[in-house]
Amino acid sequence: MNSQSNLTQFLKDSESYKTIPIVETITVDTLSPIQIVEKLKQDIVYLLESKDESSSWSRYSFIGLHPFLTLHDDQNKYIARDAAGQKLMQKQELKELLDWMKEQYQIKTPDIDIPFTGGAVGYLSYDLIPTLTSVRPHRSASTIENAHICLPTMIAFDHETNHVHFIQYTQLTGHETEDEKIRAYKEKQKQLEQMIHKLHSKVDMKELILSGNMNEPPSFEHVTSTYEKAQFLKDVEKIKEYIRAGDIFQGVLSQRFDIPVSVSSFELYRVLRIVNPSPYMYFMKLKDRDLVGSSPERLIHAKNGHLEIHPIAGTRKRGTTREEDAELARELLEDEKEKAEHYMLVDLARNDVGRVAEYGSVSVPTFTKVVNFSHVMHIISIVTGKLKRDTHPVDALMSAFPAGTLTGAPKIRAMQLLNEMEPEPRETYGGCIAYIGFDGNIDSCITIRTMSVKNHTASIQAGAGIVADSVPENEWEETCNKAGALLKAIQLAEHIFSEKESVQDESPTISSC
């Protein structure tokens, strides 16, 4: 570590900025993001990880520690609070609060070539939609806040180079003497060295060994649903009636599954990343719950004014050989129902990008390409555009939110109908996980294939896209199948990590899944 040159740069940066990064980079061999979290877990707030070797989207994992600022919504306003919970600022919109933060803290971004070097990390609940659209709130009040957390310490793990970048932001008031700046620098440098030293220590971590039982189907024993099956089937028919009447083209009806758990959220995550690896994986500690997820689908990416959405619709299980994969891909691209749904979602994405893009800049450089993931293949297109001048990147995020793949089309009418039918507010399901960088860049994924873990209960929500020729029983089964990978992860985690009998309740089992 070249501390003297770093100090010289730090003092120079302090002339123009109040929040200055100190960066140290190490190269590792056997260390993994999982081991880093285990060794530093008392301080960890989130792990954002890419885990799908066959996907070109996967390269970086990001770990956040020591929150200093939380941005959350409260009665249609956004509030910034410090680590002690003291209210610092209130604004009408998230983008206004982010702009205040940028001005207040005068943050310098580090000169390092990675997509995220620090910023706000968090989630937007699906139930945010009444503040963005004319859709009325769900009849049952949502219990979850929208929140983004800013952290002074971040670790970026580059899986391609095996470099681990430690970024420590140092906050100044702007009135320090040079001696005070040097002391502040040395204190942060010491914290960095202590953190890196911890990574050399041994950790008591139970090895995750999965055997042949990975291939067994998930059990729905002790799993309950918020939706009565008979009502779900009736609501599928209702949506088909609205489609025949011309109100909508598609509606995504969902149900929530609850299952008791006795293992930790991070143990659930460790198994999920093996059972269902995806380009967007996350373990997040929130105020009243943890989120554990493996989403395959980007919501929107904004970098230096370039916007990108990846509509996904159309799915087949992977084959066992290249030849079988090729045959399945051909069948998928010839399936008229799958193609029609995909075309509709591409049009939705073009519309979402078009609202915030320069006129004439929206394009579809990749159209209906079959991409292989670990267990499935999807039809994917890419829609791009150039952000309008003087338009905030957060406006692009809000334009795409919520994803049409989780609502149906047209979005507004579909969301209105879903709010009338679904028995509970969606909360995190169908929302997004996002990072909003200090540099204004954004990456986000749709909150699907996700567990919300609270009070020893894991909640999993899954939906089915209802179209004119949908068979109600098949749509019910589709929601059960989509929840299956996460239920399997829970049951494997209980088998591997639990030192006591699994937590049970007296709720009836869903025997029909």
Swiss-Prot record:
Its biological purpose is as follows: Part of a heterotetrameric complex that catalyzes the two-step biosynthesis of anthranilate, an intermediate in the biosynthesis of L-tryptophan. In the first step, the glutamine-binding beta subunit (TrpG) of anthranilate synthase (AS) provides the glutamine amidotransferase activity which generates ammonia as a substrate that, along with chorismate, is used in the second step, catalyzed by the large alpha subunit of AS (TrpE) to produce anthranilate. In the absence of TrpG, TrpE can synthesize anthranilate directly from chorismate and high concentrations of ammonia.
What name does UniProt use for this protein? Answer: Anthranilate synthase component 1
Where chorismate binds, per the record, is at 314-315, 429, 449, 463-465
Q: Which GO biological process categories is it annotated with?
A: L-tryptophan biosynthetic process
Which is a Pfam family this sequence falls into?
Answer: Anth_synt_I_N
Q: Which family does it belong to?
A: Belongs to the anthranilate synthase component I family.
Q: Does the keyword Metal-binding apply?
A: yes
Q: What's noted on cofactor binding?
A: Binds 1 Mg(2+) ion per subunit.
User: How is the protein's activity regulated, according to its record?
Assistant: Feedback inhibited by tryptophan.
Catalysis: reaction(s): chorismate + L-glutamine = anthranilate + pyruvate + L-glutamate + H(+)
The superkingdom of the source organism is: Bacteria
Binding sites annotated in the UniProt record for Mg(2+): 341, 478
Molecular function per GO: anthranilate synthase activity; metal ion binding
Keywords on this record? Amino-acid biosynthesis, Aromatic amino acid biosynthesis, Lyase, Magnesium, Metal-binding, Tryptophan biosynthesis
This entry's Enzyme Commission designation comes to: 4.1.3.27
Annotated L-tryptophan binding lies at 50, 279-281
